[in-house]
Swiss-Prot record:
This is Phosphatidylglycerol--prolipoprotein diacylglyceryl transferase. PROSITE patterns: LGT. Pathway: Protein modification; lipoprotein biosynthesis (diacylglyceryl transfer). GO terms for cellular component: plasma membrane. Catalyzes the transfer of the diacylglyceryl group from phosphatidylglycerol to the sulfhydryl group of the N-terminal cysteine of a prolipoprotein, the first step in the formation of mature lipoproteins. It comes from Ehrlichia canis (strain Jake). The chain crosses the membrane at residues 13-33, 50-70, 86-106, 112-132, 169-189, 197-217, 232-252. Its EC number is 2.5.1.145. It comes from the Bacteria. It is a multi-pass membrane protein.
Amino acid sequence: MIIDQVAFRIGPLQIRWYSLSYIFGMIFAYWYIKKIDKYQVFNKESYESVISWWVISVILGGRIGYILFYNLDFYIHFPIEMLKLWNGGMSFHGALVGVMIGMYIFCRKNKIDVLAAFDLGACAVPVGIFFGRIANFINGELYGKVTDIKIGMIFPASGDLLYRHPSQLYEAFGEGFLLFIITNSLFFFTKIKTSKGMLSSVFCIWYGVIRFFIEFVREPDVQIGYIIFDQITMGQLLSIFMIIMGFYFIKLAKVQDKFSI
């Protein structure tokens, strides 16, 4: 399948679907967190400045993560390419680490509860993930392995005419849609939000597990392939660390609950 990677053009300026996915994701996160928070975690003044922290943290984290995790040798030889964001190359795990560091600094600076802020993010971020994976699908990148199932698709970027798993759609559904339903159902219909850090743990563990298993039907990145036992990809390794981080959030939540009794 072939879909134009450019959503629309304004004169010589090309607006790509992947760029729009980041824009839509951040706008939604800002609007949605403000809607469900109702100034309980973030105050009015902090909302006016937090968006710039999100944008910078996501872009820097995503780019640095991609460089370090997926294509370090290339960027060592061609360092100027690091600045060419329009050529692609972003890592979700890197963006997550980036935004967590950025939000930690922002929250400490503004005397905001860090875990409570992370929990709000756990409710909104899945929508950004959904948009990002749909953009990957439109771009025909991050496609799956060859398959004979009926929903298999041809991705010209693979260099062949074989039917492959639409792994981008699997991820959009599992990491995006389902994760949004889960975190928000817990937020609105249970008391889990009173245990600060638990929603963050659900986010990390669910995403890590879903990503780990979907990677088995996703074609590994050509520049690094498999990194452990000719079976485990970089995405899976990073997802394992994400799961571990999720259990660490559970520990933090329990510690905070103990001292708040």
